[in-house]
Amino acid sequence: MTITPQQLIALLPLLIVGLTVVVVMLSIAWRRNHFLNATLSVLGLNAALVSLWFVGQNGAMDVTPMIRVDGYAMLYTGLVLLASLATCTFAYPWLEGYKDNKEEFYLLVLIAALGGILLAGANHLAALFLGIELISLPLFGLVGYAFRQKRSLEASIKYTILSAAASSFLLFGMALVYANSGNLSFLALGKSLADNTLHEPLLLAGLGLMIVGLGFKLSLVPFHLWTPDVYQGAPAPVSTFLATASKIAIFGVVMRLFLYMPVGNSEAVRVVLGLIAFASIIFGNLMALSQTNIKRLLGYSSISHLGYLLVALIALQSGEMSMEAVGVYLAGYLFSSLGAFGVVSLMSSPYRGPDADSLFSYRGLFWHRPILSAVMTVMMLSLAGIPMTLGFIGKFYVLAVGVHAHLWWLVAAVVVGSAIGLYYYLRVAVSLYLSAPEQLNRDAPSNWQYSAGGIVVLISALLVLVLGIWPQPLISIVQLATPLM
């Protein structure tokens, strides 16, 4: 197989991030310098983002039988790169107070970003599995990065064992699907799964096992039990990556899989996915009601957000708007989560033991950090889906798609879930404006808005507000990002 210059250009983001991994590795071996390695990582991720413009000029193509680079792959690659950049930016001040080796953190984030980029363009079950493993394996190390904290170590062990189990389910499911159809590429699977074979027990068993594996990675009920513990135990910058990059990349590839394989035509699969979505929305919101730890609360809320997205996935066969709804929703979810976790990261930096993640740490924050409180309030309103924020546009899209596909019980679940969610998001927002406690246990640095992490948080808040009032630029970008059929 010969690779043409066009194919090399199409692979630019993947190649640049891969090269950055090698450069950072050599740089660590040569001399440990936190600032140098952080800068190299951020430069590499920025270069990969810029290279997307050249990829766009190049047009859509199948680079190898496993990777398809089209507008859809570019959109999700961009979102993963933004999330990875934000993670590195939040990690820098946090690592300043960290006593052990700091530089490997960036290495692990870059390798995970590589997995996310691979998933965005995956067109083959082998690429899907490789991408998921490339994202998961570095996360084992990242979740336990603050290994002197018992919580962090426990979270890492839980995530490692459960993730390995989920991967084996996924692999076994793929093996059964392959045994039934003789193909691994999404398109060929779609052709061989024309409606007549969708009732064969072997195939349904394979799809069921794949749903278990993917449901774990997306933390959908009932495969969600690791989520709150891991979000709470992982350092704040790592929770940012877990909540954004890994969820977005994996949901992106599942969306493409369902688009090419008409699985949604099978009544059994639709019912199972519908029940999972319903349970995720209701359970995620109900469990978040009683949380006093912000990272746990955001962990439970991410379960419900994935439930909302699943509604759009189930409605995929009934129209074009599902792809658009998912793109807009994920962009809104990305910026809102980056802002919320960014505030927690700023409050927790530099590293000095546990993160500032208890709700009590944020009481009365407004009276000494007014702008930071305003940012956190905007993020909470956006995650709750209040009008004038980007979160509302995404919610509205999901509801519209559900109504269009006549999924009435799921639309009702989304409405009820959003109403429950309003309570706990506003609880966080209100606590920022209460009277401050006598002695502060944690606080953000006084010049936080001039730090790189502060700038990322402010830009996220600005985007959530501006795109919430005028979403057309985002909608246009998402409409361009159609997968090559």
Curated annotation (Swiss-Prot):
It is found in: Cell inner membrane. GO terms for cellular component: plasma membrane. The chain crosses the membrane at residues 8-28, 35-55, 75-95, 105-125, 127-147, 159-179, 203-223, 235-255, 271-291, 297-317, 326-346, 374-394, 408-430, 455-475. It catalyses: a quinone + NADH + 5 H(+)(in) = a quinol + NAD(+) + 4 H(+)(out). Keywords: Cell inner membrane, Cell membrane, Membrane, NAD, Quinone, Translocase, Transmembrane, Transmembrane helix, Transport, Ubiquinone. The keyword NAD applies. Pfam families: Proton_antipo_M. GO terms for biological process: ATP synthesis coupled electron transport. Disulfide bonds: none annotated. The keyword NAD applies. Its EC number is 7.1.1.-. It is an enzyme of class 7 (translocase). NCBIfam families: NDH_I_N, PRK05777.1-1. NDH-1 shuttles electrons from NADH, via FMN and iron-sulfur (Fe-S) centers, to quinones in the respiratory chain. The immediate electron acceptor for the enzyme in this species is believed to be ubiquinone. Couples the redox reaction to proton translocation (for every two electrons transferred, four hydrogen ions are translocated across the cytoplasmic membrane), and thus conserves the redox energy in a proton gradient. NDH-1 is composed of 13 different subunits. Subunits NuoA, H, J, K, L, M, N constitute the membrane sector of the complex. Belongs to the complex I subunit 2 family. This is NADH-quinone oxidoreductase subunit N.
